[in-house]
Amino acid sequence: MLLIEYILIGSVLAALWFVTERRHRRTRRRLQALERRLQDSAARTDRVERHVYADLAARARSGVIPPAPAPIRFLSQFGEDALLFDLFEGKRDGFFIEAGAYDGTSLSTTFALESLGWSGLLVEPMPGRFAQCRDARPGSRVVHAALGPRGSRGTTAFEVPEAAEGAMADLAASIRLSPALARQVGGDHGAVVRSIRVPLTSLAALLNQAPPTSGIDVAVIDVEGFEAQVLDGLELDRYRPRVLLIEDLTHGQDARTRDLLVRHSYERVVWLGHNGLWVDARDDALLARAKMLADGGAIRGGRS
């Protein structure tokens, strides 16, 4: 009887070891795949920036466009700003929206566009980041608010870890977290969690207050999982950006966002890191240029 028990225990331990080892191998493969994706994204970003700087210099030398008023700093994480510059062929008077603008500079997609002469609407819910953004971006309208679906008004609560130590706590302080997750992040990284209330509105309501005079060229949506709600609040049947750059950590699996954009005749052209670039499918020339850049121009790889 004792021998049988030893055999059973040995079999169970062997099975547990096999399952654990298989999970470890799967995790290693996923981490290796993520590392390759990050390396590919960094390489694409480098190619895009080299292409854009060379193109900008050539245009300025030939007189096609005037020299830039100041050196242009491309700050985005995956070269999104450089691609937008190329996509709009160095346009100097565009209009953008950035929902989730953070401090206005860190990994900003629209900072370079404002440096070129664009203006826009920047929205940031966290009070400290809003103040930094307002100071850093004098050429645009900066609004302190959280964004929701159409008809949103009043205030909403945020659970905010006040960063004590570590980048994760600081990052968590910039985004909207559930109370449980906020407490977990705060506790894990030495931060105290507090609840704050911030103004709640929609993008369409903000645009109604100061409508863009010549349409919306670009809308950047980086709202940590609330993309579908914020897009609903933009009211795409009224305010229709030519290009949408939308963070999607599900990499296309979020049917709510995807279906809403397809229903409004947008086509996803390329992935830049975890950001999908969507172009108005009714704008034939812009869509064709975006596909050209994705297929063999400034960017190689990452097509939808």
Feature map (PLM): residue ranges:
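Phosphate/nucleotide-binding beta-alpha loop and adjacent structural elements of enzyme active sites
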Residues: 2-6, 19-304
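Alpha-helical transmembrane segments of integral membrane proteins
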Residues: 9-13
